[in-house]
Amino acid sequence: MDNIYSTLFGIFMGEGNRGEVVGHDEVNDYTIDTCYTIDQGWETAVWYKEYPMIIVARYPNKEMATQGHNEWVETCTTNRPTHAFSVQTDHIESFMEE
């Protein structure tokens, strides 16, 4: 983006808040998405079926984001978690309605 106005316009219009993707996988009805976001940097979001997503991790660089993404794919493949700590809310959140 060229300047602050285009950055703010992009955020307002919902553009530019999802940049480079290092992983997008669907396993056991979970979706695991790791990408660069304009507001928080590298982060992994996980959601189950159509329930709201949980931001489960943030990373300082692409390499750690890739590693973290792969770990979440493995977790959702083998453990099928029902809850996760949200780095966005600082609480343990449920992947499903209780």
Feature map (PLM): residue ranges:
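Short N-terminal "domain-start" leader segments
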Residues: 1-43
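Acidic-aromatic/histidine active-site loop/patch
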Residues: 65
